[in-house]
Amino acid sequence: MVMKKFILAQCLMLLCFAASAFQQKEVNVWSSAMNKDVLVTVITPDSYNASQSYPVVYILHGFSDNHLKWTERGVVGALVDQYNVLAVMPDGGFSSWYFDSPVMPEYKYETFVSSELIEYMDSHYSTVKDRKGRAITGNSMGGHGAMYNAIRHQDVFGSVGCLSGGVDIRPFPENWDIKKRLGTIEENPENWEKNTIINMTHLLTPGSLNIAIDCGQGDFFYEVNCNLHKKLLEEKIPHEFTSRPGYHNWDYWMNAIKYQFLFFCDRF
């Protein structure tokens, strides 16, 4: 009886792999701006063929995580197969916040994400080499990073998502190493004012970016996300804002990322 259950479990596992046969690869991408290799996880669909061009979804991880975090539960790979796109997850460092840091010249993660990584993917994979075929999203620090890079590089990205993102960092001057990247808020207030998402909406041309924001109602970033939503409404910037019961955790994000992929792929 035990052996039969074991064989059944193995068969079910094989069926799962057969149904979702995406390919996952870890690559080193050289950053001239930072003079180092950056680890990047690339997932291609089972149907990947160099004769076809594929849209790309870039996914940025949160504080203290790395390029592998989004792959741990298999959801992203299944979405890649479902929508026939590529997913790219760069290592954003322990706490880069995806800035080109004004106080730490060796931290140039904006340049890496919005320039060097794009160039690498477009030259090494069969991608849609146009902003309309690129989306970027992320969770927490990565949600901030996605919005930050997309707003500042609307010529590069056509769609942006934000999952529980730190879209206003000013209420959190002592948290998550932000002051290491911008300097303290007391000594460098301008760095904090101009590098927080809620103060960057004037850079948006209405309709220039497809924007999808998602944050749980029990999240400590919920209030700042609601404030950004209200400001975008006031400035008549089209966007989708989703608010559901949930917290700042992977249970929420693993569900929310499915809707982000649907949002992006409807617009590719």
Annotate each PLM feature.
Residues 1-6:
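Positively charged n-region of N-terminal signal peptides that target proteins for export
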Residues 12-20:
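Hydrophobic h-region of N-terminal signal peptides that target proteins for export
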Residues 21-268:
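Non-catalytic cap/lid and distal C-terminal segments of serine-dependent acyl enzymes
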